[in-house]
Design a protein with these regions (language model features):
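Extreme N-terminal "head/tail" segments of very large remodeling/mechanoenzyme assemblies
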Residues: 1-134, 141
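Extended, Lys/Glu-rich alpha-helical coiled-coil stalks
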Residues: 129-169
Length: 169
């Protein structure tokens, strides 16, 4: 998982979740922030993240700027791909990217995140990387992730086929 200008984290690409993980740290260092981002990857449900009503909502906290991104790199038996999450029209949106994570897709040579997701798209075009259209709804995102999309272009991005994904906490 990669945070770029997200949740008070300027940049972090060293969070590996491909084995056992143990988070420790004092209060306020980001343990719950990271856990909620992981949970949101699987359930894409802002209401089921355990964020109290007194706190900033998921969208505003994790995506405060036009260049705030969370990139999930997913490794499957068919290779790696990324899921870019970002804010558009005041909601979290997604774009599936048919490539492993590469910093230069999202950050320029001056170590500044690209200002908008359209700039990311232009860079992907420059590198000849395939990517999906923007996914605007959580339902469509979950259907793609869990193999229930009716569009064959998204089959390579499914983790598994499950019609019961709504049962994920």
């Amino acid at each position: 998982i990669i945070f770029i200008n997200s949740a008070n984290i300027p940049y972090s690409d060293d969070i590996y979740l491909d084995g056992n993980v143990h988070f420790i740290g004092t209060q306020g260092v980001g343990k719950s922030t990271l856990l909620r981002a992981i949970l949101f990857f699987y359930n894409a449900d802002r209401q089921r993240l355990g964020i109290s009503v007194e706190k900033q909502n998921y969208t505003d906290y994790y995506f405060p700027y036009s260049n705030s991104y969370i990139v999930y790199e997913v490794a499957t038996e068919n290779g790696a791909f990324c899921i870019l999450s970002f804010k558009s029209m005041n909601r979290v949106c997604y774009r599936f990217i048919h490539s492993p994570y590469r910093k230069e897709f999202f950050i320029d040579e001056n170590r500044v995140a690209y200002s908008e997701s359209d700039r990311v798209r232009a860079v992907l075009d420059q590198y000849g990387i395939e990517y999906s259209r923007i996914i605007y709804t959580y339902d469509e995102y979950r259907n793609i992730l869990y193999g229930n999309s009716t569009s064959p272009e998204f089959s390579r991005y499914s983790l598994m086929e499950s019609k019961q994904y709504q049962n994920i906490p």
